[in-house]
């Protein structure tokens, strides 16, 4: 079996047979947290990110409330950046390895949002499995492995967190 009991073949088969009731659909309502623009620089420094997050935490929370995402994707920002700035529910998935995927529940005003924290997509050129460099497909493979693992452990988890989009008429009634 593969990583966390989910094999690469299972992920590929899953993606190939996806329809609107699958995890690909849930990602279509994802919000990607961008704590700070890097001013055109290639890299951000973690200590700078932490300061930007502290200064902008209320704006960030308000953006999450407004957008009401079904999933939030963070680019490796939990540990030592936003971990003490939000309320957190339980850790749903704790990956391991060079670039681990972690899935938490972030809580704002008593509402829980699945928060997937993994390396930023711009780091895909740096993703290594041993001596072999991986492509962007590896990024999505790791993401789907984690999501499928959560779904196996908690059937119906992802569908239970589908939120109304902020611009849907039904959300305004």
Describe each region flagged by the PLM.
Residues 70-71:
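Structural motif
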């Amino acid at each position: 079996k593969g990583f966390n009991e989910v094999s690469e073949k299972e992920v590929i088969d899953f993606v190939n047979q996806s329809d609107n009731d699958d995890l690909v659909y849930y990602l279509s309502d994802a919000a990607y947290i961008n704590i700070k623009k890097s001013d055109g620089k290639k890299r951000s420094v973690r200590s700078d990110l932490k300061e930007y997050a502290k200064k902008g935490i209320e704006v960030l929370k308000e953006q999450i409330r407004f957008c009401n995402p079904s999933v939030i994707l963070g680019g490796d920002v939990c540990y030592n950046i936003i971990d003490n700035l939000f309320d957190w529910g339980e850790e749903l998935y704790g990956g391991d390895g060079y670039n681990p995927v972690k899935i938490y529940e972030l809580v704002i005003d008593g509402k829980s949002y699945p928060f997937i924290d993994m390396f930023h997509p711009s780091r895909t050129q740096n993703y290594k499995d041993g001596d072999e460099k991986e492509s962007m497909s590896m990024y999505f493979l790791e993401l789907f492995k984690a999501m499928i693992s959560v779904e196996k452990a908690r059937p119906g988890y992802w569908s239970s967190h589908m939120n109304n989009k902020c611009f849907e008429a039904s959300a305004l009634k």
